[in-house]
Amino acid sequence: MTIMVREALPEDQAAIDVFLELHDTAVVARLGELVDARLPPALIAVDGERLVGVLTWITHADSLEVLTLHVTDQWRGTGTALLDGARRLAKSLECRRMWLITTNDNTDALRFYQRRGFRLARLHPGAVDRSRATLNPSIPDIGDHGIQLRDELELELELELEASG
């Protein structure tokens, strides 16, 4: 398996839309708003002609937010390759940090990002509860591993410190 990561092209959009729908992340609730993940730019991972991963991102002033990151097969390096691509992109855009929001039940994501240098930056207590009540009532009460889904966690990677450290 040879994974290639590249910026998505217009002709990739239909496949990205299907991929995000399959991972139930075409529209995501975070920080009190719904965001259509099909609209921002994306990095894609391909194995030959097969789409095996998508990372969508948004820039804010001097930071790059990882909006979504999903792969077809975990534990094969695809997510790491996409995240490394986003890090290179963020540096080329002169971003000082990368950040993302995940939920309190997503222990796999917490492990993944922390092992790649991200740290817990902020807790948004009750954010998922508020999103469920006001934005998307289909957000489940119970998430991964039977954990009650309540809070959003913000993780960040300071790019300046990485370059000097």
Task: Specify the residue positions occupied by each region the protein language model found.
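Acetyl-CoA-dependent GNAT
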Residues: 3, 7-74, 80-84, 150, ...
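Short, P/G- and charge-enriched loop/turn segments at secondary-structure junctions
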Residues: 30-32, 138-146
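Conserved acetyl-CoA-binding loop-helix of GNAT-fold acetyltransferases
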Residues: 76-89, 111-115
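Conserved GNAT acetyl-CoA-binding A-motif
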Residues: 90-102
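Conserved beta-strand-loop-alpha-helix junction that forms the acyl-donor binding cleft
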Residues: 100-109, 121, 125-132
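Conserved acetyl-CoA-binding loop of GNAT-fold acetyltransferases
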Residues: 114-122
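Generic C-terminal helix-cap and adjacent flexible tail
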Residues: 159-165
